[in-house]
Amino acid sequence: MSHKINFLNHVKFSFFIGDKMKVIYILMGCLLITACGSSNEPVDSSAPQTAVVEYVWQTKGPNYSDEALEKLIDSWNEKVTEGGYDMIGANILVPQFQPDTHDFVWVLRWPSMEARDYAWDHFQANYDQEWNKERAGIFSDNDEDVYAFSPSLGRPMKAGNGNTFEAEFNFCNYNEGYGESDLKKFRQDFGDYLDEDEMENGEGTFWYVMLDPLFEPTANVQHTDYLWLNIWGSKEDKDSGYARYAETDLQTQADTFSTCQRFPHSGRVIR
């Protein structure tokens, strides 16, 4: 079932790695929370809920400017505050390459799918018309391009992370004869390396998460075996971290069991 979407409108999900554009999205401040139970079981309000991060592709219009975007961010934040939505935060992600599908991504972070659904429904009923009028000609959502994921923390976020950051999405498929056990072994070895690196060079701003899609693949997008998201607090930390990483055998180990594509982005916190 397909739905035309506005910025906060109730939609179905799809996973995106199309031929022209593999993916754009980012997570900041993710929560590691256990999965929800079966829908056939009674709801336990005390049970942990699954955090959700979703990405809304945006296309610039003829009247776009950075100043106009800032005014719209302020207006959107006022609406979200007035609506009282249970939202962890929001970011904007700009690809550091040239996708032909969109110009930037608006990222929404929720403590649960229930909180997400309530906010989308309430926003549509109370603010949608005004919001669409305000941003007409400046930017627009891409139809159907709203994508949700469940995050799991691989390395804790460091205190050095601020309102701007660098992110890199690694879309990976296992090579023939390899699988999850090889990824698990690599993550253990990588964690040991990070511990040693921090002891030698001090604590940096690097952290990472694994992202699992909450939807079925579509004609435009196919699943990969795993999705690894790296995050740094600055471009300088990213470059120096990669330089030290290149002196190890870890990349060779990773290339042995899987083949990955990297997609770099710059991001900033807007809520």
Provide a role label for each language-model segment:
Residues 21-29:
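Sec-dependent signal peptide recognition
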